[in-house]
């Protein structure tokens, strides 16, 4: 809705909630790139499809930053454990790292393991 400066954006940006990252075609790497393109668009508010009826543009940036922070935290935890397949241990380290900034977001504890697992998969595939 250009006149209203509102962007309808579903599934890749749910304000204040970490994403459900377990669909076969989910790619945090590609989502991060897409969110950067969305951030460059001229709009003020989003209609996310999940969560609140609308939210400010800043929520797009917050989700992108979460994905970048998640990727960094997974890499650090993987290095610390020395085992890319220690998903439980890596997830606990990532939760501890990200909890101060994102711990109040919806599904933080419930969906973090699938977020970590998806980042690990992408790293194994060379993203």
Feature map (PLM): residue ranges:
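Accessory terminal helices/loops
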Residues: 40-42, 53-127
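Metallo-beta-lactamase
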Residues: 1-69, 76
């Amino acid at each position: 809705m250009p006149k209203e400066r509102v962007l309808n954006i579903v599934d890749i940006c749910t304000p204040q909630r970490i994403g459900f990252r377990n669909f076969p075609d989910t790619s945090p790497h590609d989502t991060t790139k897409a969110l950067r393109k969305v951030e460059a668009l001229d709009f003020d508010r989003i209609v996310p499809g999940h969560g609140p009826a609308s939210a400010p543009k800043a929520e797009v940036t917050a989700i992108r930053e979460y994905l970048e922070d998640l990727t960094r935290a997974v890499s650090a935890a993987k290095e610390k454990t020395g085992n890319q397949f220690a998903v439980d241990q890596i997830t606990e380290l990532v939760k501890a790292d990200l909890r101060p900034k994102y711990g109040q977001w919806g599904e933080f504890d419930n969906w973090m393991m699938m977020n970590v697992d998806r980042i690990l998969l992408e790293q194994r595939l060379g993203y």
